[in-house]
Amino acid sequence: MGIHQLMQFLKEKAPNCFRTLMLDYFAGRTIGCDASMAMYQFLIQTQSAGLTQIIELTDKEGNRTGHLVGLFNRTLQFLENGIKPVWVFDGKPPLLKSGELARRKKLKEEAKVKTELALEQGDMQQALLQNQRTTTISSIMKEDAIKMLQLMGCPVIIAPCEAEAQCAELCRAGKIYATATEDMDALTFRTPVLLRGFNTKKEPIYEIIYDDMIKELELTYEQFVDLCILCGCDYTEKIEGIGPGTAYKLIKEYKSIEGILEHVQKVNAEREKNNQNPKYTVPSKFLYQDSRELFITPLVQKGDELQLTWNKPDVDNLKKFLIEEKGFAESRIDNGLKRIAKKDPAGFQSRLENFFGKTTKIIHPNNSKAKAKSNKKTEQPQKSGGKKKI
């Protein structure tokens, strides 16, 4: 979920923190990409409605591959435009997120029932919509994505916890230019630059500058965190009766959630005297202090301690993995290689050598030995796969 309605709120209250830019603006930049968020997007985008069934891309064993298609093409798109992607995956979710995860699981189960009902009724558009809401990422899908990206020579980080928090840490450490994610809580984790909208080639990308945002809102970082918690985040329930606009006014006046809670208590007590319903409803488990702590001091690997290494793509093993194991069409991969080669008459290899210089793959400290011995060949590919009917 990220932070509820934060994007719209910032457009209204801090419009000067936004810029809309085309992809080629970021040439030469290193961008930290929220891989888990991107995988969900790609899995949803690669589903389609047949006459009587929902169709998904899969390998010969039935494992979904839409996320690989998307990550592969997105990586090629970045490389074509001179952008260095660093892919960051979620680690173990914080305990504070268990309530939100349980809520999402319930919604997915409900969507599964609605999918089956829509299929029985022959309403394929409704079936597709509901099936998209059942999307989950399995451990196999995550492992496949990591393997493919590493074979492509890209840096891969497995965060200890939240990917957005790890990206924000890398950005503050100067290891990357920006965090690319649709989750607005990257700002709550204090990423200096947030990029949203890497969906199509032709649409502009939103760049949000944290310092400009804070300056225009006239808030401290701690107050902004409290604002985000009041808007609604993944770690606690929110106070009913307080939306983003009201939250902002209250933070400006009372400075913190503690001050606002005192105000809420007085307002509700006064209304009770007048036999009126309470204006605000504070949840019984309003874990704002724990949520605040998680945003301000998240579990991350220190940016200064991470070694980033870009390697040349291992084309032979990449082709073997995508074609033989995952059912990609060889022509799709070769076409992907050509997309890069077109940018440099001298060919794909020299372009990558010029682009990567002395190389980047990010290695989790616990797996550094195993992953450091990557084969050093020369190239890079693109999509395809089987189809699975639901």
UniProtKB/Swiss-Prot annotation:
Keywords: DNA damage, DNA repair, DNA replication, Endonuclease, Exonuclease, Hydrolase, Magnesium, Metal-binding, Mitochondrion, Nuclease, Nucleus, Phosphoprotein. Mg(2+) 2 binds at D183, D185, D234. DNA binds at R74, E162, G232, D234. Residues 348-356 are annotated as: Interaction with PCNA. Structure-specific nuclease with 5'-flap endonuclease and 5'-3' exonuclease activities involved in DNA replication and repair. During DNA replication, cleaves the 5'-overhanging flap structure that is generated by displacement synthesis when DNA polymerase encounters the 5'-end of a downstream Okazaki fragment. It enters the flap from the 5'-end and then tracks to cleave the flap base, leaving a nick for ligation. Also involved in the long patch base excision repair (LP-BER) pathway, by cleaving within the apurinic/apyrimidinic (AP) site-terminated flap. The gene is FEN1-2. The keyword Magnesium applies. GO terms for biological process: base-excision repair; DNA replication, removal of RNA primer. It comes from the Eukaryota. InterPro entries: 5-3_exonuclease_C_sf, Flap_endonuc, HhH2, PIN-like_dom_sf, XPG-I_dom, XPG/Rad2, XPG_DNA_repair_N. Belongs to the XPG/RAD2 endonuclease family. FEN1 subfamily. Interacts with PCNA. Three molecules of FEN1 bind to one PCNA trimer with each molecule binding to one PCNA monomer. PCNA stimulates the nuclease activity without altering cleavage specificity. It is found in: Nucleus, Nucleolus; Nucleus, Nucleoplasm; Mitochondrion. Its cofactor is Mg(2+). This is Flap endonuclease 1-2. It comes from Paramecium tetraurelia. Binds 2 magnesium ions per subunit. They probably participate in the reaction catalyzed by the enzyme. May bind an additional third magnesium ion after substrate binding. GO terms for cellular component: mitochondrion; nucleolus; nucleoplasm. Phosphorylated. Phosphorylation upon DNA damage induces relocalization to the nuclear plasma. Mg(2+) 1 binds at D34, D90, E162, E164. Its main location: nucleus. Residues 126-254 are annotated as: I-domain. It is an enzyme of class 3 (hydrolase). GO terms for molecular function: 5'-3' exonuclease activity; 5'-flap endonuclease activity; DNA binding; magnesium ion binding.
